Amino acid sequence: LMPSEKWNFSAFGKYYRQYVAGPMAEDDTGSNYVRTSRTVDSWGYGAAGTYFILSGLQAKLSYEKAYRLPTIEEMFGDEDLESGDIGIRPEKSDNINLNLSYSRSFGKHSVYVEGGVVYRNTKDYIQRNIQDLSGGKEGATYTNYGKVLTKGYNVSARYGFGRWLSVGGNFTQMNVRDNEKMQIGSTGNSVENLGYKARIPNVPYQFADFDVNFYWRDLWKKGNILSVTYDNQYMHSFSYYSQAIGSKNKDFMVPDQFSHNLTLSYSLKNGRYNISFECRNFTNEDLYDNFSLQKAGRAFYGKVRVHFGD
């Protein structure tokens, strides 16, 4: 629905259906497997509207009753260090988003700025937890956790000059908190949740990225483009165990991470042929996954792509 160029409104509905089937181990040894299947059905809905407050300044507001269906890995694991649960339920959440964006062009210059706030009330949150395995190894399991409340914001900006320069970045802060006041104790009774209002473990909550892009158009021949891109990603340190339980939280921290990448691409004949070379983490920083396991260091990639057809 678009009553005018100044504002519009839309409503929508979604139907989710998931059917999965595959072998599941009957015990921890994995000596015997049985074929298991499951079907999940869910309905979602929402509404969104936009309004131009001033020329170039737009407000956006949306609400959605959303579902996140479990992934194959969350249901079946990876037959190595990930243990799945075929009975895991979809996440249910009420999501509210409010955004303000401003765009303007003057001469060869263009500016775009956007900021937004997020509110998400989630039930049956799908959580990835650590478990001890034999031989001193650790693995992961997936469970539904009762209630989780997310409040956050994000800011992004981009500047362009003519057709040869683009600079931009994003910053995000997501406060993901345990919103379950009570939990089931070891004897089956209801007890106070010591992690209530604490950050959900193993979830990054502050991160940012930045990129600079240079373009040389019609280089050596009309329709060819050479582009050079520098980008980086920053992630603030976070805990992969509950910070509300235990006294040595620093032992379970994923440290700050800041990586840098460089990409060189050359496109020929209006994009029909493309060659690119990329160096990821070219400063060889120490990078980690969500369980503080170190990732590979500096890496080089090359890619050739050919577009067939008109």
What residues fall within each predicted segment?
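C-terminal beta-signal and adjacent terminal beta-strands/loops
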Residues: 67, 123, 167, 228, ...
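Gram-negative outer-membrane beta-barrel transporters
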Residues: 5, 113, 118-121, 141-239
